[in-house]
């Protein structure tokens, strides 16, 4: 189930990149957020209640973080191979796991990840989009904030209701950006169909699979399995998008995967999905 979730998310990201020429990265974000929110709303509508006070503040903040992470990550995807972008973004959950640990040995994971990131940023001696690297790292920092805020939201608004409302808020936030880039092309049948696929693959399906997996697996095992995501992204990018990686980039991704697995196993807590 965890592997299925990972493959679903990365397939959704690969599908989203096919929309970039028509509606731009931000148009694709609008499709993902909008259809993802509608899918969640279908499951939570009957039990949904309006937030108030602290709940409302946590929901709005969570929605803003979701919007920022997706906008920056999809811009990074427009400039970098899928595997590279996802690997760089993974500094978020890795950082949260390490900062939450008080063990000095966890600095080893930081060092491993740092080497991997430097190798990726260097592009293996070839051309690399520096802005894409920066955007992916910003998205990773946002994912770290997402993890922290996810815990806060879960305490203030238990269940999927808070996430559903946050996704709706994120959709409202990204709408001006998506409409500015996508324009009338967002209303075409092919874009809407692909957007629905992105929303389901990137949000609804992985959430369902991960919730079921968390009921069956220890947190540490779940976290280690989730750390395979950069490798899965590289594989999907190679198969679906014909994105070849240099040997040094493969090694760099392997270093970040190893660092993430070690840090998440040590922390013993899973990294929530970033929207």
Placement of each model-derived feature along the sequence:
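Glycine-/small-residue-enriched transmembrane alpha-helix faces in small-molecule transporters
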Residues: 1-27, 64, 68-72, 115, ...
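Membrane-interface interhelical linkers
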Residues: 1-4, 37-61, 102-108, 125-126, ...
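Specific transmembrane alpha-helical segments of multi-pass solute transporters/efflux pumps
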Residues: 8, 44-85, 117-119, 199-217
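Transmembrane alpha-helices of multi-pass small-molecule transport proteins
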Residues: 21-68, 94-96, 142, 146-149, ...
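Juxtamembrane helix-entry segments on the extracytoplasmic side of multipass membrane proteins
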Residues: 22-26, 30, 51-56, 122-145, ...
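Specific alpha-helical transmembrane segments that line the substrate/conduction pathway
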Residues: 27-30, 34-37, 66, 73-104, ...
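Helix-helix packing/entry segments at the starts of transmembrane helices
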Residues: 86-88, 149-171, 203-239
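Hydrophobic transmembrane alpha-helices of multi-pass small-molecule transport proteins
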Residues: 91, 105-124, 236, 248-267
């Amino acid at each position: 189930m965890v592997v299925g979730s990972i493959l679903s998310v990365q397939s959704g990201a690969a599908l989203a990149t096919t929309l970039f020429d028509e509606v731009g990265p931000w148009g694709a974000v609008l499709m993902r957020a909008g259809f993802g929110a509608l899918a969640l709303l279908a499951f939570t509508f009957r039990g949904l209640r309006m937030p108030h006070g602290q709940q409302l503040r946590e929901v709005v903040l969570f929605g803003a973080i979701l919007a920022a992470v997706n906008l920056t990550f999809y811009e990074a995807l427009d400039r970098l191979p899928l595997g590279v972008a996802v690997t760089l973004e993974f500094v978020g959950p890795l950082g949260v796991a390490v900062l939450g640990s008080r063990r000095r040995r966890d600095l080893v994971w930081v060092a491993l990840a740092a080497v991997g990131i430097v190798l990726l940023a260097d592009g293996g001696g070839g051309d690399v989009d520096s802005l894409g690297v920066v955007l992916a790292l910003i998205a990773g920092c946002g994912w770290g904030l997402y993890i922290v805020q996810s815990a806060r939201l879960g305490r203030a608004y238990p269940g999927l209701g808070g996430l559903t409302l946050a996704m709706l808020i994120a959709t409202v936030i990204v709408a001006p950006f998506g409409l500015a880039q996508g324009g009338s092309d967002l209303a075409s049948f092919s874009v809407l169909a692909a957007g629905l696929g992105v929303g389901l693959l990137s949000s609804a399906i992985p959430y369902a699979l991960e919730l079921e997996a968390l009921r069956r697996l220890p947190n540490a095992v779940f976290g280690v399995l989730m750390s395979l995501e950069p490798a899965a992204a590289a594989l999907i990018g190679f198969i679906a998008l014909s994105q070849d990686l240099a040997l040094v980039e493969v090694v760099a991704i392997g270093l970040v995967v190893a660092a993430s697995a070690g840090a998440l196993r040590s922390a013993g807590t899973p990294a929530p999905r970033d929207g």
